UniProtKB/Swiss-Prot annotation:
It comes from the Eukaryota. This is Transcription factor MYB90. Expressed only in leaves and siliques. Interacts with BHLH12/MYC1, BHLH1/GL3/MYC6, BHLH2/EGL3/MYC146, and BHLH42/TT8. Transcription activator, when associated with BHLH12/MYC1, EGL3, or GL3. Promotes the synthesis of phenylpropanoid-derived compounds such as anthocyanins. It is found in: Nucleus. Pfam families: Myb_DNA-binding. CDD domains: SANT. Its main location: nucleus. Keywords: Activator, DNA-binding, Nucleus, Repeat, Stress response, Transcription, Transcription regulation.
Length: 249
């Protein structure tokens, strides 16, 4: 280093060194600090001479506590510039950067931190609204009705089952299951045939009764035509029910 290589003195300044530095600055003025140690006859580096003059020996330096106006200005400048003490001291006449930094760290730093914390807490309380529990609202989505056919049996999805067996067929409801309608084709066919036979008998009886009443009123000349009507072939009637087409003369 510069001091160790040249054997320069370090540490506290003596009163003799301070007087030599004052005489040199009064004679040659401030500046050209690299020539000050040689002119003053000091075994100090140029940086040490400059800092000693600017921080302690300069006549315009103010000593003592800062006034209220200076403290207010210091707070504003620190909020704007941060810890740039040399820039802050340049805006406080008669105050050095070292004095401003020491005063801040000793008297104002703790108060500033506490005030900042309080302001942040107030902002959080103002910005964040009181949290209220969110109420969940159940939404019922409509389900489309679909008609599905499974194994020859029909039912509506999502709806109670409907009895799809016509009452005219005479089928019992014992053949209906919980989920689908089961059908027995043989029993259904037998019931269907029995119903048809019962209907045929009733139709023939009604037909015969009407013919008998007509015989009592119509003259004997129409008996031949009535006999021809009664001679309707039963086999042709059965063929009609079986699905065969028969041409009648």
């Amino acid at each position: 280093m510069e001091g160790s290589s040249k054997g320069l003195r370090k540490g506290a300044w003596t009163a003799e060194e301070d007087s030599l530095l004052r005489l040199c600055i009064d004679k040659y003025g401030e500046g050209k600090w690299h020539q000050v140690p040689l002119r003053a006859g000091l075994n100090r580096c140029r940086k040490s001479c400059r800092l000693r003059w600017l921080n302690y020996l300069k006549p315009s330096i103010k000593r003592g506590r800062l006034s209220n106006d200076e403290v207010d200005l210091l707070l504003r400048l620190h909020k704007l510039l941060g810890n740039r003490w040399s820039l802050i001291a340049g805006r406080l006449p008669g105050r050095t950067a070292n004095d401003v930094k020491n005063y801040w760290n000793t008297h104002l730093s703790k108060k500033h931190e506490s005030s900042c914390c309080k302001s942040k807490m107030k902002k959080k309380n103002i910005i964040s609204p009181p949290t209220t529990p969110v109420q969940k609202i159940g939404v019922f989505k409509p389900r489309p009705r679909s008609f599905s056919v499974n194994n020859g049996c029909s039912h509506l999805n999502g709806l109670p089952e409907v009895d799809l067996i016509p009452s005219c067929l005479g089928l019992k409801k014992n053949n209906v299951c919980e989920n689908s309608i089961t059908c027995n084709k043989d029993d259904e066919k037998d019931d269907f045939v029995n119903n048809l036979m019962n209907g045929d008998n009733m139709w023939l009886e009604n037909l015969l009764g009407e013919n008998q009443e007509a015989d009592a009123i119509v003259p004997e000349a129409t008996t031949a035509e009535h006999g021809a009507t009664l001679a309707f072939d039963v086999e042709q009637l059965w063929s009609l029910f079986d699905g065969e087409t028969v041409e009648l003369d």
